[in-house]
Amino acid sequence: MRGGAWARLVTALMLLVQGKCQQAQECSPGGHRILQSPYRSVHFDSVYLQYSAVQDLICDHSLSPGWYRFLIFDRPAEMPTKCVEMNHCGTQAPIWLSLSDSEALPLPGEMKKLTACATWQFLFSTEKDCCLFQIPVSVRNCGDFFVYLLQPTQGCMGYCAEAISDVKLHTCGPGETENEGGCVGQLSMAQPPAPPAPPGRPKISVELLGSLVFCRCTFDVSPTNTSVGFLIAWSRLSSQEIKEELRQESTLQAFSLLELDGINLRLGDTIFCSAAVFYLEKPDVQSIAVESQEFFAGIKLKPELDTISEDGKEYQLKIESTIPIVCSEFSELDQGCKISLKLKTIEQGKEHLGLNLALSSCHVDLHQNSCANGICSQAVLYYTAVTDFSRDGDRVTDIIVEPIVNDVFLWDRYAPDSIQIKVKDVPSAYCYSFTDPHIITFDGRVYDNFKTGTFVLYKSMSRDFEIHVRQWNCGSLHYSVSCNCGFVAKEEGDIVTFDMCSGQLHESPSYLFVKNQESSSSNIRITESYLGRKITIWFSSGAFIRADLSEWGMSITLRVPSLDYRSTLGLCGTFDENPENDFHDKNGIKIDHDDNYIAFINEWRLQPGRSMFDKVPASSRFPAKPSYCSCWLGTAMHHLLSHHLDSRSHLEMASGCKGIKHLQFSSLIPDLDITSEYINSEALAGKLSPHVPREENNLNFLLQKNAHPNLSKLDLNLPHPGNKILNPPAYLSDERHTQDQEMRKSLQNRWKRQNVKDFHPVYIFQSLGQGNLEEFSYFFPEDHTEDSQPEFAPSWPTASGLTEFSVLAICQQTLANSSIGRLCLPFLGRTLNHVVDMCVKDVLLKDDVNWAEGGVALLENECERRVLEDGKRNVEENRKTVEGILEVLKCPNLCSGHGECMGWGCVCSPGYSSYDCSHSYGMQML
């Protein structure tokens, strides 16, 4: 057959085929209907529709029987011939066209009867069934497109479609390859199309759909004239900080959802999503993938600072959930929808050093709320470093959250990540004003203040805390020297006056008055040691002032907390670890001229009528201080030393949230809490309740007091303050064992130097008003003496014949060879030498060896301080030394060999008394 005839035959056959197609009614525009919902795309994840737009779900159970053609975004589409995943194509059970190995799609003009399948996966099943349901479908190839004879489904199923190219639906020729239904071989040599513009950076958010939580990845897309799809990938960080892919999908929507199911994606995961754009016509042509910022799914603890100091400052701890709170249907309505968190603190390091960090609460609730700016629920609490008055170095504390117990599977047993807080150790400081007085500043500088009058011992520049002291002439036979006779201490609304300056030397009782200016409760604590020889006033900041009483007056010990570091003025110096600038003026500027210490003392001497002895400062309101908890997840006490040094019971702390102040009050010297004797309801009612001396330290007395004192607990929520008379320490004789009537009678002579009407003791227990306080004012002549430092040059031997060598031997024996001096020598160091030098000077000036014992109290206080500061470290090395120190602090001089050391102190043998059993009945005590 000739070539021309062959060509005419082929043309005729083609026209015949086309004629048959044109004759098929279903191929004509009016012979079929169009299904063009983009949700029918095999790339569309329909989970979102099930929870947010259920009305848009594809359900073909109401589809009218007939011929249909598929379009997606006005582009040709056809039913897929491969199994489609469940929850795609805008429905739960997607329907696809199943072709057996022997089956193929019809050629142009042909029609075939085929089978469609619906995919389904049963609950708790790990495998899907691609052909659980079968539906007969007829397919006609109309040349440029397919049409399908469809019928309604049995349930909420939907017919799927996938986009194809505009290329004719015919078998590709030699050298051509099919791509989404099109022949592209002839384009292989052409310039490849430019990739689409990349999307904007994806953002991950969360949303609650019903009772399920989904992560949503969204991004912006540049406008385009070409149909595009999106390739979205989800990944998370593994425990080894390596990204691992969770899921990848192609979709027509500029978002993707991933369920936070607690199995594949869990709370505590760090999640990423990436997105790329591709052409629907050419899926292999893609933009670069753009990845989101990391998204943390869970609860985070966000501290204001992760390194803080022992300075009393408070810091905010935010607890934030990036995931909405989900509650089960069984949740109690009256409890609300919330997640409850229990917080604990764990101290790092092997040494058992006690509480380091306190929280305002050990329990916090996260309530259900709407999400905003990435936060779905938030709670705030506070943390602060515990001022422990120990040189324990910088320490690290973990704040952990116990695993959550919840009915919702997603939240149950979830434990948010812990955080670490480093606490920098800041020193506390002690100042001593003893006997003459000799003053040892906070930074260790030693000087003498022989002046009389009223002085500013201490003033904080960072808070409302100030102490004034009075010094009177304390009876030297040859020289004019002074001693402390009283103090007034004020911390915010609490004012304490301890005063024996109103009477005569050796005769004046002590007057203790407590006032709170702003509320019915006071934040102080008063303790007594050694049967009244030591009186300590504890303040809520951790500061204390201690008076060691004697017949000539009192020696004063002052401790201030680390929050006053580099913020102090007054006779006690600057507290900045630099003794060179301790002599300063009222502006804190160092005094440099030759007589700097004289000028320094004059700078802090108060004019008559200007001190807190004369007038109580005006009342001020102070903000309420938040309470704090010990959330310490610690162990029970396992060292003897810890039992004595820790300010609170570790067992008590470990039991949960125990209310504490953000500082630790510690005392190694056994004390008795006598706060209620000075701050109680009887004082408010104006009832007389005299303080009974405790010199009668017989066995019955100790048994009544129930032995061992509580060295740890400080109840700072006390009743309204009152005031009382505190008798001076007893210099025991038989006549001291008298009745209350004789003691009260002795009170009548105590205001011998007052310049107002005679004192009546009942006034002390009446109103706390300003007028009453002014009524108690007295004339203090030392405020009106000439402002000059006594100049004298004492020499050896003294008038009574005491030599320097003999006095030094007495001081060495009294102090260095005392039980406290010997046992505490490793802790005291050169302080012992300072105290011995003070002793020698005291005896020289007074020409009286009885003054040698004045330094024992300083050794006791300094020893207690050193052990508290340093004793917690090297516990095993210091164990025996500290045990001995604790014994002599409890029973001074080991009861002088005339008594038995018990839990509270010395129980004296018959015929002996005093706190150390050193006094024999009938012997006048020196």
Swiss-Prot record:
Residues 429-612 form the VWFD domain. It is found in: Secreted. Keywords: Disulfide bond, Secreted, Signal. Disulfide bonds join C431-C572, C474-C483. Its main location: secreted. It comes from the Eukaryota. The keyword Nucleotide-binding does not apply. The keyword Cell division does not apply. Residues 1-19 form the signal peptide. Pfam families: D8C_UMOD (PF23283), VWD (PF00094). This is von Willebrand factor D and EGF domain-containing protein. GO terms for cellular component: extracellular region.
